[in-house]
């Protein structure tokens, strides 16, 4: 066994799985880029206070799951557990909110949460995300949701469902909070859960323990207590989703794990993943920007799990991504032949052809075995005699047929054989 291994809960992606990883990561954001969302690259770590204030101190993310440490300057920093707070911080810091609105941004990368590792739940999780900041418009909510839906479908995934609800606004949330606390304080909850109920009662509804879920099954539902404005907003979002033909299921008991969500809140679920069924989600966060020191502007966004989407595709028996296999494999039979084939490989690669070469002293048989394993359709075989004659052997690895081709014509001949 090797002396060093990846840390627990931190997956490696190596070929051929890495090809699917890249395809999923990029595919999930294809619809966003077509809708005018520009790329933003965020720091891997931020000031701890950004997440404590933005995500919410009562959340499991902040209280239990963050990787937080003091740097050499004794500053408290945290590996990013999610993307929205960092995006909002960047929008404020760089004055993007002073330009055209909404600010449309997308991102991809690793995020970090200290969780109990299991299939689909990692301590380093790969996500893509989208944020639209500056406009409070239900049509924008629908656009963001439709982009996520299109991202999954572009990969061929179809066994998922969109669950959606509204978490209300500043008008109805305080009244509902009192109603929910009254209900919760009437239950036989443990001390820690009662503390959470006092601090933020919605967090209790997000508790995954079966005994707590059973006790809160009859809790009042926020969707039944929406203000007129929040209800109108939600109804309009649903109308737009209907027009866009994005199917959804209303889940009145949905509670997302982050405190900044308001109004529209949604999650994409795939039952093929077992307990870790969520493959992405998001919502509106109308007070977050002001809370982080910026203008009082609204926003909406989502985060989609690359790791979990890969597992969902596997559950459906589907695969995406172009493998690293090459089209052409070069077999040099001498040192001079290595130079000749290196030049031809460069010319073919410049034309979009994937080329690999045999390195080391494998001999003809060993090099041809490597060519067969490479998955290439064509092998280029040459030695000193071929170089003197100004030719290269071009072998069809499917039929075994080999012909001598003028060195100057090899590139065109190979491209023709590949049907390019």
UniProtKB/Swiss-Prot annotation:
It is found in: Cytoplasm. Its main location: cytoplasm. One of its GO terms (cellular component) is cytoplasm. Pfam families: HGTP_anticodon, tRNA-synt_His. It is an enzyme of class 6 (ligase). Belongs to the class-II aminoacyl-tRNA synthetase family. This is Histidine--tRNA ligase. It comes from Mycobacterium ulcerans (strain Agy99). The gene is hisS.
């Amino acid at each position: 066994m090797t002396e060093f291994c990846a840390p627990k809960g931190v997956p490696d992606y190596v070929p051929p799985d890495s090809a699917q990883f890249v395809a999923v990561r990029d595919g999930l954001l294809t619809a966003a880029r077509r809708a005018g969302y520009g790329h933003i690259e965020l720091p891997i770590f931020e000031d701890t206070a950004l997440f404590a204030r933005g995500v919410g101190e009562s959340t499991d993310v902040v209280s239990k799951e963050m990787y937080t440490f003091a740097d050499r300057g004794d500053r408290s920093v945290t590996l990013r557990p999610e993307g929205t707070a960092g995006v909002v911080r960047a929008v404020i810091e760089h004055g993007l909110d002073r330009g055209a609105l909404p600010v449309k941004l997308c991102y991809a990368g690793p995020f970090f949460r200290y969780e109990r590792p299991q299939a689909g739940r990692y301590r380093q999780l790969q996500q893509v995300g989208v944020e639209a900041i500056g406009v409070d418009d239900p049509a924008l909510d629908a656009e963001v949701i439709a982009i996520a839906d299109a991202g999954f479908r572009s990969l061929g995934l179809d066994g998922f469902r969109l669950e959606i609800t509204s978490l209300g606004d500043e008008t109805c949330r305080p009244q509902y909070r009192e109603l929910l606390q009254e209900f919760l304080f009437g239950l036989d909850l443990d001390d820690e859960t009662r503390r959470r109920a006092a601090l933020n009662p919605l967090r209790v509804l997000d508790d995954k323990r079966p005994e707590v879920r059973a006790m809160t099954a009859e809790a009042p539902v926020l969707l039944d207590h929406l203000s007129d404005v929040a209800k109108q907003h939600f109804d309009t979002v649903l109308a737009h989703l209907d027009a866009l033909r994005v199917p959804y299921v209303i889940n009145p008991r949905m509670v997302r794990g982050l405190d900044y969500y308001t109004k529209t809140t949604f999650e994409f679920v795939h039952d093929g993943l077992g307990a870790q069924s969520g493959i992405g989600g998001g919502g509106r966060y109308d007070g977050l920007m002001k809370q982080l020191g910026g203008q009082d502007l609204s926003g909406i966004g989502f985060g989609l799990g690359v790791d979990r989407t890969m597992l969902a595709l596997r559950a459906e028996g589907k695969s995406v991504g172009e493998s690293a296999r090459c089209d052409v494999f070069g077999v040099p039979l001498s040192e001079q032949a290595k130079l000749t084939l290196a030049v031809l490989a460069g010319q073919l690669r410049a034309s979009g052809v994937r080329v690999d070469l045999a390195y080391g002293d494998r001999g003809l048989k060993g090099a041809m075995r490597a060519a067969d394993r490479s998955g290439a359709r064509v092998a280029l075989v040459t030695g000193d005699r071929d170089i003197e004659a100004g030719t290269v052997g071009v072998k069809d690895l499917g039929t075994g047929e080999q012909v001598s081709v003028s060195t100057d014509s090899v590139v065109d001949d190979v491209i023709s054989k590949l049907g390019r």
